[in-house]
């Protein structure tokens, strides 16, 4: 993930927790101690601070030197010179605060059992809260300035670095309330997270699941964490028992979860109305200045190409020899018993070969990342077990991995390197104020690498089994990233629109909406079980206010980028990687040759999905498996 600026850090924490939700925790038993891993496979955080004392010096500098200075600017930002001084001081402070915060968190992730480092992390979080409070007056004061004044600053050469920032402020002006109104909305934020908090407490703390018999007849405890693994089991009866065990538990609390989700939707509608937006969807999209047409066209394009998903479900039915496909049949691998054991050194070579189309300069940065200890490679005792990319403006990027010799690990590494090199190029090109990469474009950089890698591996596949494995990997990736996420997006849109019309959302209503979507998306070969219509009750993303559509747009955009790169047009893409937030996300993508306001990118990706399914079917027929 990309390093975020101040106002993005909380969002980053929430989103990051969902992205790595299936693998987060402490390291498993029997893994090596950190001291047993050669230095070349460990990231070098000393590139940020060579000692805890130097980290502490910067922490104190932020707290005791920078923060007190902002009192001198409060109430004085109508003075052009004072405003410029204040913005520059904020950037100066934030560059140091970012380093302090990022270092402490990454250091803690090396060993989550180290109490001394956990203290550092806690101190950095307290510091960031104080930083946030110290600069919180800036935007409200700017928003109270006359539009004419803000526009004049945008034309002033001394504000050249802040032109984009001021333009974004100006766009928010029609949606800004009086000081009293803003104060009320700020007070409301204290309980705005309550629906999500109740959902997580209920789902992860209070909800209990039954014991079931596994595929060998042993009694096991069913948990949320183990459920995904059980759905991949070859034993259909076991999969069904796991499915029914999970969803029968959610069925007991469906009315509570319906009330919780309704509260979340009503909250979004309330804030949208308060800020004079036409809808909750419009208010959410406005945070990254995304036109409504992008969301609507995404749903339209997926609906127009839903036949390809129906074809894939039909293929599943044939391969698994079923009368009807149920939801617990959608995750068992179609390609069994094919494993690719790829050690880390091999992975590096594969990535350097697979990403060759990106050009010599990109490969040069890749080699720097591999050779200069940007990457923490292997699982160790008490190490954070997710995977991410992070860093600050004044550091090189860092990547945390738990590499395990699988194809999934290779693709994860390529993905995180995409984020890292995006960050590297942006920070080398943009001023701090424009160095944040919005999520809408950040995931394009990482997904582009994944698609390039799979294309490369498909070209060098030595057998039908290897090719089938890779095809299935890509098909499942597109299904999960596009079809499933757009199904979620369509559900979110409908439930918000119903509340905006004054309709109530009961558990029955929500299940009916979900059931109808399942019928539409999965087609005639699919059987919608009554318990499966409770799927909405488990999804944390529905408490993230129209977030999931970005997964789908990112993959569609990345597919267009890859086609251009494979034609030899890398220059536009490298410029895209340098853009940061120097322009709005839609414009940045247009400069890279991708227009996400049209349906074309999604149409192209899903047509490709259909072709991949056709090729899978052809190989399976050749092998006599269908």
Report residues per predicted region.
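C-terminal, non-catalytic "cap/extension" segments appended to globular domains
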Residues: 35-37, 45-46, 50-52, 142, ...
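Hydrophobic core
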Residues: 14, 18-22
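Bacterial N-terminal signal peptides that target proteins for export
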Residues: 2-13
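Active-site-proximal, well-structured secondary-structure segments within enzyme catalytic domains
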Residues: 157-163, 211-226, 255, 259-402, ...
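Post-HExxH zinc-binding segment in Zn-dependent metallohydrolases
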Residues: 437-466, 474-480, 554
């Amino acid at each position: 993930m990309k390093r975020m600026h101040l106002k993005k850090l909380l969002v980053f924490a929430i989103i990051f927790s969902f992205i790595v939700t299936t693998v987060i925790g402490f390291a498993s038993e029997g893994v090596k101690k950190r001291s047993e891993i050669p230095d070349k496979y460990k990231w070098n955080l000393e590139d940020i601070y060579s000692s805890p004392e130097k980290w502490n010096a910067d922490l104190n500098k932020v707290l005791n030197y920078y923060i007190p200075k902002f009192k001198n600017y409060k109430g004085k930002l109508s003075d052009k010179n004072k405003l410029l001084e204040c913005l520059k001081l904020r950037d100066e402070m934030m560059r140091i605060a970012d380093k302090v915060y990022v270092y402490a968190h990454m250091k803690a992730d090396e060993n989550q059992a180290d109490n001394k480092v956990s203290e550092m992390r806690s101190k950095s979080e307290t510091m960031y809260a104080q930083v946030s409070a110290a600069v919180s007056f800036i935007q409200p004061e700017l928003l109270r300035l006359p539009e004419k004044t803000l526009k004049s600053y945008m034309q002033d050469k001394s504000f050249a670095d802040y032109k984009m920032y001021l333009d974004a402020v100006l766009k928010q002006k029609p949606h800004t309330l009086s000081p009293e109104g803003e104060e009320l909305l700020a007070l409301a934020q204290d309980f705005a997270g309550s629906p999500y908090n109740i959902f997580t407490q209920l789902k992860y703390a209070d909800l209990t699941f039954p014991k079931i018999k596994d595929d060998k007849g042993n009694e096991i405890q069913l948990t949320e964490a183990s459920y995904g693994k059980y759905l991949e089991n070859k034993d259909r009866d076991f999969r069904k028992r796991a499915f029914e065990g999970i969803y029968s538990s959610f069925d007991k609390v469906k009315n509570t979860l319906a009330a919780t989700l309704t509260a979340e939707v009503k909250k979004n509608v309330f804030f949208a109305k308060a800020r004079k937006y036409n809808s909750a969807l419009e208010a959410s999209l406005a945070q990254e200045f995304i036109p409504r047409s992008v969301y609507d066209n995404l749903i339209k394009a997926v609906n127009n190409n839903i036949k390809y998903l129906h074809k894939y479900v039909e293929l599943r039915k044939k391969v698994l020899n079923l009368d009807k496909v149920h939801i617990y049949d959608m995750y068992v691998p179609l390609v069994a018993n094919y494993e690719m054991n790829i050690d880390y050194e091999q992975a590096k070579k594969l990535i350097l070969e697979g990403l060759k189309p990106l050009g010599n300069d990109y490969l040069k940065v890749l080699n720097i990342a591999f050779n200069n200890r940007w990457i923490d490679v292997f699982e160790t005792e008490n190490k954070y077990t997710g995977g991410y990319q992070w860093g600050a403006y004044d550091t090189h990027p860092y990547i945390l991995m738990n590499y395990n010799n699988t194809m999934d690990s290779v693709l994860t590494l390529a993905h995180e390197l995409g984020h890292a090199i995006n960050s590297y190029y942006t920070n080398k090109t943009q001023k701090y104020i424009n160095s944040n990469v919005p999520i809408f474009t950040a995931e394009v950089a990482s997904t582009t690498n994944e698609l390039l890698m799979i294309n490369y591996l498909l070209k060098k596949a030595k057998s039908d089994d290897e090719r089938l494995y890779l095809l299935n990997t890509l098909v499942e990736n597109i299904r999960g990233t596009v079809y499933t996420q757009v199904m979620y997006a369509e559900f979110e849109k409908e439930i918000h629109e119903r509340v905006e019309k004054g309709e109530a959302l009961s558990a029955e209503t929500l299940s009916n909406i979900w059931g109808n979507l399942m019928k539409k998306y999965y087609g005639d070969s699919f059987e919608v079980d009554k318990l499966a219509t409770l799927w909405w009750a488990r999804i944390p993303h529905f408490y993230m206010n129209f977030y999931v559509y970005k997964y789908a747009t990112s993959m569609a955009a990345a597919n267009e980028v890859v086609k251009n790169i494979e034609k030899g047009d890398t220059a536009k893409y490298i410029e895209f990687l340098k853009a940061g937030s120097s322009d709005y996300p839609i414009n940045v993508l247009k400069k890279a040759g991708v227009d996400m306001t049209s349906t074309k990118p999604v149409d192209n990706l899903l047509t490709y999905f259909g072709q991949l399914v056709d090729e899978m079917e052809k190989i399976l027929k050749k092998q006599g498996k269908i």
